[in-house]
Every structure is written in structure tokens, then in C-alpha cells.
């Protein structure tokens, strides 16, 4: 179950890559294969990718859109992962004057965020049930 949030420059101006790379580094993101990963206990929670083709970050990259992506089934704590993605998105939006959008690049509403959080809670419950079934087997 992929969760995707897009962050798009309000005026479609290009993000300052040096500033963005420094910002991501300060938040603990790790540059891996030309995208940035946010890890916990050496497991990827979510990643930040270039939302424009070719989808990667390089020194000469120019982009006005980035995407935050997480696979909730791979996450150790799906609900917390979504919360951290939203916190990151708000911080990024404030710093880089970006609009938080859904996977279709439509500005996101509180209702959409609540829906994603509910989906994450459902996945967390299912993971817990499967874990309990495995332990009890």
C-alpha cells in the first residue's frame, strides 16, 4: 500500500537544490541511489524523490516538485510513518513555499489526510493480527 504526497512549488519556481540537500541532511535523510531515505532502525520509513522525470536527484537536478513515498506494508509502524510524512511535508512546505498535494497533485485536504491516517491504522491492525497469529501458531 503506497502512500504518496507531492510537494509542489507554489509559483512553480525551481527548488534550490543546495538548500534542499542541506535541509534533508539536517533532518537525517540519507542520499541513496539518487533519492533521499528516512530510516528508522536501518529500515526505510519513507523516501523523497524528484516528482519530475527521471525521478532522481543529481547535482544538476532542477525541479519544482518532489514526492514523499512510503510502502505501509513494509513499514514497522504504518500510522507513525504517515504522521512523520505529514510532519515532514509541513516543514518542507513552510521552508520551500510548497503546496502539499495528493498522489494526483491535487491540493490535499484535512479529510484526505484523515483517510490516509485511517488506512495506516487499518494496516497496522492487520500487521498486529498477523503477528499474533504467527506467534500463536
Please state what every model-predicted region is:
Residues 1, 37-45, 102-114:
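Short proline/glycine- and acidic-rich turn/helix-capping motifs at secondary-structure junctions
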Residues 19-24, 82-90:
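Short amphipathic alpha-helices in soluble, non-transmembrane regions
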Residues 28-38:
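Short, well-structured beta-strand/strand-turn elements
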Residues 42-79:
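Long, continuous compositionally biased terminal/linker segments
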Amino acid at each position: 500500500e503506497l502512500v504518496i504526497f507531492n510537494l509542489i512549488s507554489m509559483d512553480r519556481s525551481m527548488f534550490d537544490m543546495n538548500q534542499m540537500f542541506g535541509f534533508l541532511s539536517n533532518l537525517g535523510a540519507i542520499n541513496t541511489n539518487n533519492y533521499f531515505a528516512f530510516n528508522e532502525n536501518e529500515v526505510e520509513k519513507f523516501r523523497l524523490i524528484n516528482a519530475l522525470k527521471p525521478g532522481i536527484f543529481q547535482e544538476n537536478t532542477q525541479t519544482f516538485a518532489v514526492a514523499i513515498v512510503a510502502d505501509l506494508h513494509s513499514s514497522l509502524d504504518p500510522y507513525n510513518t504517515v504522521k512523520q510524512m505529514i510532519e515532514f511535508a509541513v516543514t518542507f512546505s513552510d521552508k520551500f513555499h510548497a503546496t502539499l498535494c495528493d498522489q494526483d497533485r491535487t491540493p490535499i485536504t484535512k479529510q484526505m489526510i484523515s483517510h490516509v491516517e485511517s488506512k495506516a491504522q487499518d494496516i497496522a491492525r492487520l500487521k498486529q493480527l498477523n503477528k499474533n497469529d504467527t506467534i500463536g501458531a
